[in-house]
Each structure stands twice: as structure tokens, then as C-alpha cells.
Amino acid sequence: VIGSGPSGLAAADQLNQRGHSVTVFEREDRVGGLLMYGIPNMKLEKQIIERKINIMKEEGIEFRTGVNVGKDITAAELLKDFDRVILCCGASNPRDIKAEGRDAKGIYFAVDFLKSTTKALLNGGLTDKNHISAKGKNVMVIGGGDTGNDCVGTSVRPVSYTHLTLPT
């Protein structure tokens, strides 16, 4: 199975339940695709996804992360090593708009913003400073669907962490 987003996980789970040996390839560093990086934690806690993935691993599904199919492994290699290949790679290319100033600094695609923020949060609580931050900025979101609302929520949501050490 190529891709570990919603369709990839569903396909892997169904095939595994029917007795097939299943390997899932994911180009990112974590399994889950859109579920892991595209939906903010305020809507879908990542520990829920991680719990499901751990159950799938215990049931025998193999996950290979950091593998970009087509670059790191060819289609010919996959077809040689596996009986069947299922493409569940989603739509990762953003839809651009033609507007004056579109190429100005500080304009980002929604998926890049959400992925960057979620990845930084998972990697260390936004301490890496490599993510796209909306802190202290005026933010305009074009689009009012789920993705637009996720961007608004991520932009205005204060992220703070308190590390508490309890005496033992």
C-alpha cells in the first residue's frame, strides 16, 4: 500500500483482516498522512492515530516511513517484491490561485501551514522555529471550508506548554 493516510490505513486494515501480508509505504517520517499532519490536534488528537497504528503493527502490518515511492524505490521494484500494489497517496499538490501579489513573502498554502505547525508541535512543542508561525501576525485565510477553518483555528490557538516535574 502506497500512502498511510485514511485510504491507505483502511486498505491495509481490510487486507490484513482477510489474511494478506501488508506493507505500507509512507514518504513522511510518521504514519498517518492527512490524519497526522493535515488535521490539527485540536480536531484530532494524534495519540488516537498512534494508538490505531500500534494496533495495526501488532496485527502484523509493516510500515516503512521515509520512503518516497518513485524516487527511493521504483514501481518495478515494488512489482517484483509484492503481488499487488495499491495507490492511496492522496492529493498532495495544492491548488493555486492567480492573484496579483500571490508570490509575495509570507503567503503560504494551507496544507504547508498546517503540516509545518503540526510537525513542529509533534517534534518538540514548536521549539524548532522552523515552522510557519502566525504568532503576532495579522492572518488572512482565503476559503471558508474545513481547511480554511483549520488554518484560522491553528493561527489563533495559543500553544503553550508547561513542563511540571513532580517530586518522587
Regions found by a protein language model. Give the residues of each.
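Residue-level detector of alpha-helix initiation sites
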Residues: 5-7, 30, 145-147
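Conserved small/polar residues in nucleotide/adenosyl-binding loops
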Residues: 162-168
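Glycine-rich dinucleotide-binding loop and its adjacent helix/turn
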Residues: 54-71, 94-158
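Glycine-rich FAD pyrophosphate-binding loop
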Residues: 21-31
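N-terminal Rossmann-like dinucleotide/flavin-binding domain of flavoprotein oxidoreductases
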Residues: 34-84
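Glycine-/small-residue-rich beta->alpha transition segments that form the dinucleotide
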Residues: 84, 88-95
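N-terminal Rossmann-like FAD-binding beta1-loop-alpha1 element of flavoenzymes
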Residues: 1-21, 152
